[in-house]
Amino acid sequence: MKALWAVLLVTLLTGCLAEGEPEVADELAWQSNQPWEQALNRFWDYLRWVQTLSDQVQEELQSSQVTQELTVLMEDTMTEVKAYKKELEEQLGPVAEETRARLAKEVQAAQARLGADMEDLRNRLGQYRNEVHTMLGQSSEEIRARLSTHLRKMRKRLMRDAEDLQKRLAVYKSGAREGAERGVSAIRERLGPLVEQGRQRTANLGAGAAQPLRDRAQALGDRIRGRLEEVGNQARDRLEEVREHMEEVRSKMEEQTQQIRLQAEIFQARLKGWFEPLLEDMQRQWANLVEKIQASVATNPITSTPMPEEN
């Protein structure tokens, strides 16, 4: 395992020189001490190494080693996410049941999206291994190019899923902090003077009446914001698919043009191979004919016939 991480480190250093700022941005976005984010960092590192499609990656993709490593990293990440979510649930405290259910549902949905896309990535790598083994009328370069395109697309999707989950957990954590603060305030009220207790009780009654309205407004705002984010993500995915389709069409056209050019060159070479011997044979025959005529003239010179005299 240490050797694998050493290879990953060298690959990452090489990738940073080649890809520049986008990789640095990914690293900066995940500087955190939460265990689930650290597990996700390990998943990112391994995915970056797979994306290099180096000779070692190609060799390990032929076996089940890559998918096994991804499975372990995926399970570690999702286990840490579940543990962190459970920890926040225990800290959530006395919040409205509607708010608790909404926050839990949002976190669960974001967690499910991340897990499903990780599973899709693992299945795609398994499909690549099968395609390489069968090679059904395709070249290895075509299969590798298609895998590289799919990995880039999946990496973007996974990054969006991870960012969305991070936001949802941050909201969940904020609710837990508010619940803890309310618990501390309740203890302070019970230990305070009786007059202060009455004043705080009156203030809490007013806040309790306004709380459902605030919860409904927040829920509506969250639903609208979530819908806008979903529409934006769908639009970005569609644009990305169109761009990738255009790139595939352009690549296929270039490949077909190259094939036509090669076929024309082959046909030209065949024509040349057919006609050159024929021309050479005709030239030899013509030269032989000329030589025979010249030889005949030399051995049988033409004598001039005298003209008859006129009377």
UniProtKB/Swiss-Prot annotation:
Residues 150-160 are annotated as: LDL and other lipoprotein receptors binding. Keywords: Chylomicron, Endosome, Extracellular matrix, Glycoprotein, HDL, Heparin-binding, Lipid transport, Lipid-binding, Oxidation, Phosphoprotein, Repeat, Secreted, Signal, Transport, VLDL. Its main location: secreted. Pfam families: Apolipoprotein. The modification Methionine sulfoxide is found at M135. It is found in: Secreted; Secreted, Extracellular space; Secreted, Extracellular space, Extracellular matrix; Extracellular vesicle. Residues 1-18 form the signal peptide. GO terms for molecular function: cholesterol transfer activity; heparin binding; phosphatidylcholine-sterol O-acyltransferase activator activity; phospholipid binding. Sequence repeats lie at residues 72-93, 94-115, 116-137, 138-159, 160-181, 182-203, 204-225, 226-247. This is Apolipoprotein E. It comes from Mastomys coucha.
